[in-house]
């Protein structure tokens, strides 16, 4: 399934009838089983319905870092992002990709 950023934003955990999605490097993961983390009020709710690649690489929960852009990330931050991606792959199903 393909999602625009706008479509992905509809899966942000605020509508109980919809799953919760988080994208990493353009791949969309269904994180609904982690609702306590990614759902409304959860510690990582700022990632829900978005591509959180930059924020995950920087280990940041700042809204301005929640972005698909990898520009300017250090090698260490890229490695951190890759580690997060591996964790998500092991825990959550991939349901699609973000397209421009």
Curated annotation (Swiss-Prot):
Keyword Acetylation in record: yes
Region (Sterol-binding): 1-82
Induction description: Down-regulated by auxin and cytokinin.
Alphabetical UniProt keywords: Acetylation, Lipid-binding, Nucleus, Steroid-binding
Highest rank taxon of the organism: Eukaryota
Similarity field: Belongs to the cytochrome b5 family. MAPR subfamily.
Name of the protein this chain belongs to: Probable steroid-binding protein 3
């Amino acid at each position: 399934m393909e999602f625009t950023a706008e479509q992905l934003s509809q899966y942000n955990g605020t509508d109980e009838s919809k799953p919760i999605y988080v994208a990493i490097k353009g791949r969309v993961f269904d994180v609904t089983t982690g609702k306590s983390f990614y759902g409304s009020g959860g510690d990582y709710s700022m990632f829900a319905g978005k591509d959180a690649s930059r924020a995950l690489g920087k280990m940041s929960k700042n809204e301005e870092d929640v972005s698909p852009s990898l520009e300017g990330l250090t090698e260490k931050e890229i490695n951190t992002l890759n580690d997060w991606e591996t964790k998500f792959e092991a825990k959550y199903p991939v349901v699609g990709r973000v397209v421009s």
